[in-house]
């Protein structure tokens, strides 16, 4: 049961809460979504996983507490009173896999008649959360065509897993495969581990930094040369989400990789994906990437590569 700030009582079932939005299945009316700041209080006898702004997690059920904008969390060994807007994530414990899964699919295309150059961009992601971990699978492909031939290609696929250590601290694992003809490598496979700290974690913002190391293996585009490298990792990642009209979703990150194997070599990857919802779950936006390698594996390769594309995407929760 949810009690709205206007006094209305909504009967139904809480499906989840994240990004400042509660998903609620009302009796006889289907599923609705609305902002958490519209909730005065709520109650449910079901068990939930609760994540607060400070990173603390609880497992319990809810009851009203008689104080506006607050709720009583009922635990096995007691209870606690919570300010509703301090709850940033809420999931029923025994719900299925898909309730905790979200993602997006994107497509972009640019063409210049004067240069007869066309760029096709495809991208996508799948995200899943459970009690103590977060997993994300993402991929993208940027291919440039000129006069019916492929002029350059950049492809990436990455699997990242974050495992909760304590409050805002996570242990990160990632596996990545990529290719970039402009930077002179046919294929690179990478695996690494890092320590992650969420500096900001609230309704609209997620900001975290990561520090770690990885190992990679590269194949040159021009010859049979193969190199093995040990690298460090220093990264910063930011996500912004606004549900009110217009719905805005921004993800950006920059990762720096100092090379421990080749003296003086380092890599930098920057990425920005910004989109605005135009029709329910369909978005228009812009996608920008910039990659830099101070000492590419191929002698004739460029040291940097970048791309900008307008995109149309579909998101699902």
What are these regions (language model features)?
Residues 125-129, 160-162, 176, 196-198, ...:
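Transmembrane beta-barrel domains of outer membrane proteins
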Residues 304-317:
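Outer-membrane beta-barrel "beta-signal"
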Residues 106, 119-123, 156-158, 170, ...:
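Membrane-embedded beta-strand positions in outer-membrane beta-barrel channels/transporters
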Residues 131-137, 168-171, 203-207, 241-250, ...:
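Repeated loop/turn-to-beta-strand initiation elements of outer-membrane beta-barrel proteins
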Residues 109-113, 130, 141-145, 177-181, ...:
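Transmembrane beta-strands of outer-membrane beta-barrel pores
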Residues 105-111, 124, 137-141, 157-159, ...:
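Transmembrane beta-barrel strands of outer-membrane/channel proteins
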Residues 110-119, 145-152, 179-187, 221-223, ...:
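Solvent-exposed loop/turn segments connecting transmembrane beta-strands
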Residues 1-129, 156:
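Compositionally biased alpha-helical segments
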């Amino acid at each position: 049961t949810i009690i709205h700030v206007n006094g209305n009582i909504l009967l139904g079932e809480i499906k989840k809460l994240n990004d400042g939005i509660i998903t609620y299945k009302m009796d006889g009316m289907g599923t609705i979504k609305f902002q958490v700041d519209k909730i005065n209080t709520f109650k449910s006898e079901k068990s939930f996983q609760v994540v607060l702004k400070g990173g603390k997690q609880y497992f319990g059920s809810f009851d009203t507490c008689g104080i506006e904008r607050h709720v009583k969390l009922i635990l096995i060994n007691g209870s606690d009173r919570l300010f509703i807007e301090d709850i940033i994530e809420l999931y029923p414990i025994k719900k299925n896999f898909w309730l905790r899964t979200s993602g997006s699919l994107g497509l972009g295309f640019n063409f210049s008649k004067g240069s007869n150059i066309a760029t096709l961009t495809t991208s996508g992601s799948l995200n899943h959360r459970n009690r103590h971990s977060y997993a994300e699978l993402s991929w993208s492909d940027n291919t440039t065509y000129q006069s019916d031939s492929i002029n350059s290609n950049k492809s990436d696929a990455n699997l990242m897993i974050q495992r909760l250590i304590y409050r805002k601290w996570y242990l990160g694992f990632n596996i990545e495969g990529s290719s970039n003809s402009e930077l002179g490598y046919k294929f690179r496979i990478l695996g690494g581990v890092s320590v992650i700290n969420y500096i900001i974690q609230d309704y609209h913002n997620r900001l975290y930094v990561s520090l770690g190391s990885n190992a990679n293996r590269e194949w040159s585009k021009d010859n049979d040369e193969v190199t093995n490298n040990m690298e460090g990792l220093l990264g910063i990642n930011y996500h912004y989400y606004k549900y009110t009209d217009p719905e805005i979703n921004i993800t950006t990150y920059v990762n720096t990789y100092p090379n421990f194997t080749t003296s003086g070599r380092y890599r930098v990857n920057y990425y920005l994906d910004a989109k605005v919802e135009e029709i329910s779950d369909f978005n228009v936006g812009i996608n920008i990437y910039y990659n830099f390698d101070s000492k590419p594996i191929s002698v004739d390769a460029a040291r940097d590569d970048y791309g900008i594309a307008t995109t149309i995407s579909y998101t699902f929760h």
